[in-house]
Amino acid sequence: DIAPVTPGVAVDLSHIPTDVKIKGFSGEDATPALEGADVVLISAGVARKPGMDRSDLFNVNAGIVKNLVQQIAKTSPQACIGIITNPVNTTVAIAAEVLKKAGVYDKNKLFGVTTLDIIRSNTFVAELKGKSSSDVEVPVIGGHSGVTILPLLSQIAGVSFSEQEVADLTKRIQNAGTEVVEAKAGGGSATLSMGQAAARFGLSLVRAMQGEKGVVECAYVEGDG
């Protein structure tokens, strides 16, 4: 990250007892952080404030994603890339064009990370139906902005909904990000839940790359055809 506190955050994280070695890099040149990377998750960018939607972030965040993906294409072109930076629906497209221009685009290795919509859906459905969130898994397809977020509520095993419940849940899931932005009153957007969602997606990706079968995550990707 360009923030000067990045190495300090890495030191803080390194004190957590895990088998993972943690390093932090700061500055405009991401090369040291990208060398030999198999998975790269991009979360850099400005956050929403009250009254803004994700598309309002485009002018700033598009340039950030473009710059980082250019460095990935040069340093670790084989890496799987997860785009978290909003607006995901367009930053993924920008990343794809940068990779195509560099001649290293692989649609099977570029993902718009929409896992936050899934964990929100799991939470909201569990609350409504009095279930443990660990027993609920809601497939959410589409993008990560407004009406492009499509929770497949009919696909949840052992749960049924009235038409009104479907309408209300869908609306809440699609507007959950705004709920957080307004609750923070100008203090930013979702960070803690997004961190959990990013970790879930990244770990699932690694498990699948290591050969584990049956690992399924929804994401915003280029389809066939």
UniProtKB/Swiss-Prot annotation:
What keywords would UniProt list here? NAD, Oxidoreductase, Tricarboxylic acid cycle
What top-level class of enzyme does the UniProt entry assign? oxidoreductase
Its Gene Ontology biological processes? malate metabolic process; tricarboxylic acid cycle
User: Which top-rank group of organisms is this from?
Assistant: Bacteria
A Gene Ontology cellular-component term: cytoplasm
Family annotation (InterPro entries): Lactate/malate_DH_C, Lactate/malate_DH_N, Lactate_DH/Glyco_Ohase_4_C, Malate_DH_AS, Malate_DH_type1, NAD(P)-bd_dom_sf
Q: Which catalytic reaction applies to this protein?
A: (S)-malate + NAD(+) = oxaloacetate + NADH + H(+)
**Which residues are catalytic?**
144 (proton acceptor)
Q: Which Gene Ontology molecular-function terms are recorded? A: L-malate dehydrogenase (NAD+) activity
Pfam families membership? Ldh_1_C, Ldh_1_N
Binding-site positions, substrate? 48, 54, 86, 120
Q: What is its EC number?
A: 1.1.1.37
S-S bridge residues = none
Q: Which SUPFAM superfamilies match?
A: LDH C-terminal domain-like, NAD(P)-binding Rossmann-fold domains
Family, similarity comment: Belongs to the LDH/MDH superfamily. MDH type 1 family.
Q: How does it assemble?
A: Homodimer.
What this chain does, per the entry, is described as:
Catalyzes the reversible oxidation of malate to oxaloacetate.
- Return the protein name: Malate dehydrogenase
Name its species. Answer: Raoultella terrigena
Q: What lineage does UniProt assign to this protein's organism?
A: Bacteria, Pseudomonadati, Pseudomonadota, Gammaproteobacteria, Enterobacterales
Gene encoding the protein: mdh
